Structure formats: C-alpha cells, structure tokens
C-alpha cells in the first residue's frame, strides 16, 4: 500500500500564485502578510524579483476565481492561494459573494488540476475578521501551510 502526503519542510521548489481581494484591505493585507511570512520561512523567495511567486490584486472576493483562472492560463503554478475577507452586513450580498467565490475557486481548481487554497475569511463582524487576521491568530500563515502541503502532494502524485 502506498501512502502519499504533502511535505511541510520546504516551499522552495514550488511556484505559487496569490490572488488577493482589495475589499476589506485592512484584513486582507494582514492575511497576506502572514501568508508571505510563512512562505518565506519555508524557503520560498518572496522578494519583488521572485520568479516563483506572483501576487495579483482584485477588487473583491467575487473576482478571485477569474483572476485565478487567468493566472493558471498564463503560467504553470503548483498551487494558488486566494485571500479575501467578507463580513456579513444587513443584506444578502454576503451570501451571494461567498457562494459564488467558493464555487468559482473550486471549479477553477478542478478545471486546471491545480490546488487553490480558499483563504477567504467569512465572518459576522469586523472584530471576528481582525481576530483571524492577527489579533489572536493570523490565518494567512495557515493558508500558506495548506498551500505548501497541497502543492508538494500534487507534485508527488504527478
């Protein structure tokens, strides 16, 4: 019996794309920072001249799937990370954005056979979002670890 697992030891052999929603950038900037810190500590070149990391900014979480799809058409990535923050308001807009963003990201991942980490915070309040973006824990770090694991796993399986 073969057992396959992703590795957490290094990201230096991965090509990573990050798509970040600008809406709620107080939150998304913090998540991106945590994500980049983790990737750097695991050996990925995160400098502005990096050839193994690309970052794309989009207006909001709804636009994450199309940007991810365009990135995957452009280049061979081992893994993508989508980052956003959608905070519940008084209308149903929250539900629509989350539903379409999550379905879109999943569909792009399936269509291109590339893992895309769904790093979109969905919270009921700004306080909850801030807690997840660094006050208590920066989930950006976790999303990067998931990317390292899935990127290496899929490389090993192929």
From Swiss-Prot:
Record keywords, A-Z: Riboflavin biosynthesis, Transferase
Catalysed conversion reaction: (2S)-2-hydroxy-3-oxobutyl phosphate + 5-amino-6-(D-ribitylamino)uracil = 6,7-dimethyl-8-(1-D-ribityl)lumazine + phosphate + 2 H2O + H(+)
Pathway: Cofactor biosynthesis; riboflavin biosynthesis; riboflavin from 2-hydroxy-3-oxobutyl phosphate and 5-amino-6-(D-ribitylamino)uracil: step 1/2
Domain of life: Bacteria
Binding annotation for 5-amino-6-(D-ribitylamino)uracil: 23, 61-63, 85-87, 118
Alphabetical list of CDD domains matching this protein: Lumazine_synthase-I
EC number(s) given by UniProt: 2.5.1.78
Similarity-based family: Belongs to the DMRL synthase family.
Function noted in UniProt: Catalyzes the formation of 6,7-dimethyl-8-ribityllumazine by condensation of 5-amino-6-(D-ribitylamino)uracil with 3,4-dihydroxy-2-butanone 4-phosphate. This is the penultimate step in the biosynthesis of riboflavin.
Protein name (record): 6,7-dimethyl-8-ribityllumazine synthase
Record organism: Prochlorococcus marinus (strain MIT 9515)
């Amino acid at each position: 019996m073969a057992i396959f697992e992703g590795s957490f030891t290094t990201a230096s052999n991965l090509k990573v794309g990050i798509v970040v929603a600008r809406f709620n950038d107080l939150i998304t900037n913090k998540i991106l920072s945590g994500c980049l810190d983790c990737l750097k500590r695991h050996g990925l070149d995160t400098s502005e001249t990096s050839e193994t990391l690309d970052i794309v900014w989009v207006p909001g979480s709804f636009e994450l799937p199309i940007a991810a799809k365009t990135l995957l058409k452009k280049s061979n990535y081992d893994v993508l990370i989508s980052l956003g923050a959608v905070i519940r308001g008084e209308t149903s807009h929250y539900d629509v954005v989350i539903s379409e963003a999550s379905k879109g990201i999943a569909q792009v991942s399936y269509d291109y056979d590339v893992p895309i980490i769904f790093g979109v915070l969905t919270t009921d309040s700004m306080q909850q979002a801030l807690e997840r973006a660094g006050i208590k824990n920066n989930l950006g770090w976790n999303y990067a670890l998931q990317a390292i694991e899935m990127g290496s796993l899929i490389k090993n399986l192929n």
